[in-house]
Amino acid sequence: MKATSAAILVALSLALPVLALDPPPASSTASAKAQQTCGLGAAFHGGRRQELLGRVDEGLLLFRGLPETRAYLEFRQDKTFWYLTGIESPGATLLMDAASGRQVLFLPSPARNKEAWEGELWDSGDEWVGELTGFTEVRPASELLEVLEELTAKTRTIWISKHPHVAQAGCFDRAGPFDRRRAADPLDGRASREQALAEQLKERFGVEVKPIDGELFDMRRVKTAEEIDAMRRAGRAGAIAMVEAIRSTRAGIGEWDLDALMGWVHQREGGSGPAYHAIVGSGPNSLILHYSASSRRLEGGDMVLLDYGPELDHYTTDITRSWPVSGEFTPRMEELYDAVLAAQAAGIAAVRPGGTIADVERACARVLRERGLGKLIRHGSCHYIGLEDHDVGEYGEPLEP
């Protein structure tokens, strides 16, 4: 009891001087703006909005950013919302009118006490937001319904993304099935965030809600120069980390050691976190496609497979490599390694304008079958990358430069 009381007194003695301070003065416009960035720049994100508006003849386009996190985790924005705004702050909404070209950014009202805990947050009172983002109309989130009432009196269509919301380490091919399983659960049954939004819009405003995802996916599939640069930087960070992991491999260390090493190198090289969980499989664990435990010690006769990549400026990379723990290949290891390397080379050779992802898949599979390894093909050999590690895009669509 005495120890507990003493601990409380110490905590209070540390806290009281802070509590006695006057509220911190509001940051100046210059200093607040200096702490913020707008994704890949206002020109990039503004260009994405303009292109999307040019693909729609009429109606409103509504996109909601993610709310605050439920846990003590760093906030990460929904990929689609970030693509269109560059805003990495919770509680934001984007509304656009295809007919007039009007673009409105809605942000939460100022909450100074919250900023004392979490630092500068974007809100409707920040004078620098418009200059930084390119938005000429920034309004409080509390006015969203009022503006929707005004605009839906003139148009009866609202376009939204029904693509499952994903933030860091998220992919549509995981998020979509998760939402469907939860909706089908008889003891849960919750609709996805996107479905709930569609239902609310229909009920409140009597509008037709249409998906805009086809247009968004076409845009996201073909990368701009800014996106290619971000992906190259992510790839470089991932490659440096992979080389460090290979150099550090030896019998007796844990899979967790390579996991931690790569995560550290990713961040040292500018990454903001993992594009997906680390897959560090040694020995028998290397055969588990999405192994995540990282709990085994490496042994001298093992091959180790490492599949890990960072996210950098919201763009991902995906690198997989295998090597012997001892540093020397056995004849069988070399045979398998060479087969995979040959399949990879065939796949790269099949990548060309006008070709498809399906063509690349067939080229890789053909080599493996010729090497007698056809029965081991359990998954695809390639996929799009970009904002999501498994990025959007139809595999039958012709590839473009």
Which residues fall in each region the model found?
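Active-site neighborhoods and metal-handling regions in enzymes and metal-associated proteins
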Residues: 3-5, 18-401
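Bacterial N-terminal signal peptides
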Residues: 7-17
